Amino acid sequence: MRYNGPTAAVRDQFHQGTNRRAYEMLGAHPVTQDGQEMWHFAVWAPNARAVSLIGEFNQWDKEKTPMQKVYDGTWEVRLPAETFDVKSDPKRYDYPDAAKKLTTYKYCIQAQDGTWQDKADPYGFAMQMRPDTASRIYDLSGYRWGDADWMEARKSYDPYHSPVNIYEMHLGSWRRHKDGTFLTYTEIAEQLVPYLKEMGYTHVEFMPVMEHPLDMSWGYQVSGYYAATARFGEPKELMALIDALHQAGIGVLLDWVPAHFPRDAMGLRRFDGTPCYEHPDPRRGDMPQWGTHMFDYARGEVNSFMLSNACFWLEWYHADGLRVDAVTSMLMYDFCREPGQWLPNKYGGHENLDAIAFLRRMNETVYRDFPGVMMVAEESSAYPMVTRPIYLGGLGFGFKWNMGWMNDMLAYIKLDPVYRKYHHDKLTFSLMYAFSENYILPFSHDEVVHGKHSMLDKQPGDLWKKFAGLRALYGYTMAHPGKKLLFMGGEFGHFIEWKYDDQLDWFLLLYENHPQVQQCCKRLNEIYRTTPALYQIDDSWDGFQWIQANDSDNSIVAFLRTDKRGNSLLCVTNFTPVFHPQYRIGLPQMGTLTECFNTDRKEYGGSNQYNNWAIRTEEEQLQDFQYSCDICVPPLATVYFTYQRDPLPEKAKKARVIPEIADVPPKKASKTAKNPQPLPEKSAGKANSISIG
């Protein structure tokens, strides 16, 4: 990335909060001056008395490289590139290689009270590995991308009516070396790409890859917003990881933290001796619950810093979207604060009008300049119109995590099945608001830590019931309206909670139950990806119809999902360990049901109760439906049926079936499934686990 110097208009945009490429005018950049290669450094420190550039190249001496103040509060200096070469005395720097670059630097800033403090570059493209905190000069240009086809296709990508199935992961704990050290970006690519492709995920979401000083923060307390973390290698190696995923047909979302930043002395806190990035009043500038500072979006320079950062990761790293963390804390001044601990806005309300304006500007800019990407809000309140267009008064996000659905579902599955009938509303209430936003259904990292138990261990009962309940939950989730997200380890039934400082327990795949649930997830992913009824209409009642919503006594729900061509899939879930060999359901039209997926099948570790033939409906009214039939409903299981409707008298064209997902070919039609007989076993051996290298 070459530096050409900002124009007056560009500087004005920076201060107004509309500059989306502020990283081109600030930070460290290679330049050419009179034929000589140089490095240009620029930092915004409007209230500083003096600023010096310090680093290995000048033995961290603040007297050697003073910077000059520009009229708008930035400080600049330009040095020959050879300044950063080890030349005459490599031993002086403890470097055995005389060609090594002296890349580390900081800004030494004098406050108005005369004190000095060393700060990392807010716009630095690389940083040292923790516990060291210096920035590193790094030229991002020169990487040769191989994902041109992906990037071109993304311009016309419509995620709202496409399958979106996200594998959320933490790069530092997915897998590690035997000695406990991190895999590099390159090593992660070698193992992750084939695994995700084999499992059938459409996207992967990386928890924050921006530099952060504390592993325990999981990356959510960022110190280097423009720097890929050095834990796993160089920035261009992260580019190569994303490139490899794109070439395999897998999208990449990045977690992004624009709400708050840590109080580390080397970071943004009181950057020039005064609050530059945070609000000066702690009632707005502090977040006591997290021990961090909140960004002050009333400042134009802060707006440009974060707007540019969002665009930076989409442009330079080819990210396919950002999952925006802690949006609720940005929207509300009273988030996690008691009365008296926050200041109202100018109208007396609790809404942060400046942050709301920033989010709208950011989404408008991103969707204009990067068509086909996904902007996802982690927003946990009932704030309206998060995913509605800005011109209608919305925030302009593409998707929002459905935290209400997630909390209800996890509370429900923790209950002993005996008591679930008293909480049946937790299964059905989500449809009261399911189409008010564009939702993602998240079983994320936050739900498998801090004593909440793993997805498997949340299930009550013995091991068989735990695994059966988990498979039933995954089957139900895949059919529920909304895009999907599952945190790593959940796909094979990780038994203990997630640990950020250790790899997943991959050895569990040596035990039969875990590869069986992994195979179940793989099959569900395949069905979801190839069945338009499950993803084409996630945003209206046109794609969903309750078949059985009120059977609380049996804790059974059933519903139809329908695609734009009228093809329907019936989902039936039994949340108790009671087997129902003849369960009567109503249907809106005469037709044929054919079981195409069943979490109770033997190959997934189930009891192998299923519907062995095509089932014809009968003209017998049940509830509000004129037609009905009996089906076999296994214990703690989800069953999918293709629903081939007979043509109505006024229709000349027969509705199509969904042939892509039929596991069991239709046999001789039977009116009921009163005496289901098991098919011959497909395999008597153990389930195969998915290889991860």
Where are these regions (language model features)?
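Conserved, mostly hydrophobic/aromatic
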Residues: V43, Y107, M169, L196, ...
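Short proline/glycine-enriched turn/loop motifs at strand-loop junctions of beta-rich domains
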Residues: W44-V51, P588-G591
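Substrate-binding/active-site clefts of carbohydrate-active enzymes
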Residues: Q128, A148-V164, H170-H350, I615, ...
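Conserved alpha/beta catalytic core and glycan-binding cleft of carbohydrate-active enzymes
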Residues: H318-D320, F335-D501, R529-D600, S607-N608
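Catalytic cores of secreted or luminal carbohydrate-active enzymes
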Residues: E512-L534
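C-terminal beta-strand-rich structural cap/linker in extracellular carbohydrate-active enzymes
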Residues: N612-A652
